């Protein structure tokens, strides 16, 4: 019954759907990047891990930054900045791709910038969502985790049905869901207005 109550809790669901949307984009990268890097751009298999590790370094750096600024900034504001930054980065990549720029480094840098924001977005949305769950924080954590990590199914299914001969399908899914994430994060949190 707690899950039903939480599903109807608009503030909890706002942050849960926000992070789930971001994770659809993350899983689109995890699912699509081996094909894009190795098959589309011809990166040798043994070097894929190095390119992928750049994203992990970015997450670690942004997690460290998040720890330093979280006490100085409202969480909802920090979330808006992080999601907007990620959305702007992937949108620029898509615009450049539509203009004919199809370089490996465009994808690597764009992916690094968006993926790095996971160090802020995941931590902040989880904190805000669980705060809104109140006494049902245990059930909230379970529901949040199920939706966040279960969201990978969506990106895998979408990428399966899209034509897969370029970086466009992967970057399209990433861009759409990062923008959805930013839209969900954008309204001010009313709790901070009191």
Question: What are these regions, as identified by a protein language model?
Answer:
Residues 1-16:
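Juxtamembrane intracellular "pre-TM" segments in multi-pass secondary transporters
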Residues 77-124:
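C-terminal transmembrane helical hairpin of 12-TM major facilitator-type secondary transporters
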Residues 31-46:
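Short amphipathic helix-loop junctions that connect adjacent transmembrane helices
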Residues 115, 126-168, 173-174:
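A late C-terminal transmembrane helix in Major Facilitator Superfamily
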Residues 18-30, 38, 118:
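Conserved extracellular-gate-facing transmembrane-helix segments in secondary transporters
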Residues 45-53, 141-142:
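Small-residue hotspots at the loop-to-helix junctions and early N-terminal turns
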Residues 175-194:
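Multi-pass alpha-helical transporter architecture, strongest
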Residues 62-77:
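Helix-to-loop junctions at the C-terminal end of transmembrane segments
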């Amino acid at each position: 019954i707690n899950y039903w109550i939480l599903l109807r809790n608009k503030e909890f669901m706002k942050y849960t759907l926000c992070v789930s949307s971001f994770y659809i984009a993350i899983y689109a990268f995890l699912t699509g990047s081996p094909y894009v890097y190795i098959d589309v751009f011809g990166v040798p298999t043994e070097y894929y891990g190095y390119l992928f590790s750049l994203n992990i370094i970015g997450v670690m750096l942004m997690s460290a930054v998040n720890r330093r600024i979280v006490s100085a900034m409202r969480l909802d504001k920090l979330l808006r900045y992080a999601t907007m930054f990620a959305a702007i980065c992937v949108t620029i990549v898509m615009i450049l791709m539509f203009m004919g720029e199809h370089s490996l480094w465009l994808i690597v840098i764009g992916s690094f910038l968006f993926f790095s924001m996971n160090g802020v977005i995941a931590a902040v949305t989880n904190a805000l969502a669980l705060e809104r769950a109140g006494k049902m924080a245990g059930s909230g954590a379970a529901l949040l985790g199920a939706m966040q990590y279960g969201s990978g199914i969506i990106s895998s299914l979408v990428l399966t049905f899209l034509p897969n001969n370029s970086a466009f399908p992967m970057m399209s899914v990433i861009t759409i869901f990062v923008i959805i994430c930013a839209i969900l994060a954008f309204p001010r949190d009313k709790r901070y207005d009191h």
